[in-house]
Amino acid sequence: MALWVIEADGKVKRFQEILKKAGIRGAEVFATGGHLFSAPRSLHPLGIDRNYQDVRTPVRPDRVEQLTSLASLADHLIVATDPDDEGDVIAADVARLVQKIRPDLPISRIRLQALSPAALTSALERKGPVGEGVAGTVRRVFDRWIGGTFSRSQGVPVGRVFSAFLSVVSATPLPLGRVVIRYPAVDGPPFFATVPLLAGKKDEWSARIRAFDSLLPVSPATVELRPRPAPFSFGDALLDLRRNAGMSVVEGARRIQSLYERGVLSYPRTDSRGLSPESAEDLLSLAKKAGLTGFDPARLPPLDPLSPHEALHPLGESIRISDRGDQTVVERISRRALYAGLPPFPVEIPAAESLPEWARSLGLFRPLHRLGPDREPMASAGILTDAPDAVVLQGLMAAGLGRPSTLPFHVGKILAQNVLDSDGRLTAKGRVYRDKTPGAISDPGLTAAMEGILKAMGQNGEGVKKTMEALLETLPGEIREQMETVLEDPLAPPETEIERNHAPSGIGLEWG
């Protein structure tokens, strides 16, 4: 029996279907339900030793028991957890757990970019060994280490992403929404522009919008070709759904994940806005059905060779969607992906000298062609204020903080701390948190340095210890010394019942 291990329970039925379509019979599909092991909720005791191993306990002991029971009967284990760093951590945990009872069992790792037969076939062609999940492990251990060290010593919540966000907002208040401008034209529709709504500017823009009808109309001076917007990343899609469909960041993330698990959308937790040539070609039939005769797969932005995931896009599976909210998600993601393959659209630009000085830098334009299925819709003039979760999401994305898989979590955490006021500035509480956090920890550059080190060390095949040592070298000596004082002496993994008699319920601790 071949045992296939995936993450989400909601994927099991769909995964069984694509195995059958791919001609794979006699397979058992098991879902971990997410992470098998997790660190304690409390940061104290820290539970990290001087080899950078962290103590974790089973999240759901019943899943651990089921997995080991199934593995004892398998002749091959294929780990198909999500194709991201967290999926790699789960894959490493699965392999480590199974190898304790079946050291001779062949174990393979595949990385599916979508839940479809074609994606499965492609992933099987590139299958390989299970790695150590270094990147995900380093982030988990380092973030817990930072929080456990400085939250207690400083008496305020401290975190790599949270504290950096406070630093960013302190320097530059967050945009609160958008201002849509419709500037009068001599003939035909007005010219458009969209600019960020900054703190303290709402009354000024309200007055300007009310005065638009009294402005001297302008004529088009030149015609330019504008490229179509790129397909959505995960964060792009969450922001779009919040603004245009009224879905909270959490709801949007839940719906996108569900549609992925049903085989409707590609892998969701991506920061890419490009597609592979194969995926671009797959969109051609959908474009024809939508009447987009100008669609050309070659126009879609190419996938960055270093990016593990593609932009969000529909898979074209004929799956009935009855829920109106889910329909909206699919429609907006599909439209963005398909329109990215259309020809650049011509726009008319007014002469700068005919505009008042304040309007010359707005980027005013109007579409030359305003009919047809490929037209770009223009919003009505006005001030569009974003919901608080959209404000925070956009701020995180602009600062490069948080990974796609953690964006909803960080948005919720920041809002729960009440560190922002209605103008997108830090509250008194937020300023206290900022002032008590060491500058080296609240520096947004720490995240950029971490990601660069993870990429470089990963390409060299380095493990957790060397990667962590390289990361620590980016911190000032006094910060490193303070962090090192809270580490525990290296301890061997405790002997467990699973090592004696294959009884998973006896696991006490798991050292990652």
Residue ranges: model-predicted function:
Residues 1-136, 140, 144, 389, ...:
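Intrinsically disordered, low-complexity regulatory segments
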Residues 111, 188-201, 359-363:
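Short amphipathic beta-strand/extended segments with alternating polar/hydrophobic composition
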Residues 1-7, 16-21, 68-71, 75, ...:
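Basic, low-complexity terminal or inter-domain segments flanking catalytic cores
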Residues 110-192, 218-225:
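C-terminal or mid-to-C-terminal helical accessory/interaction module adjacent to the motor/catalytic core
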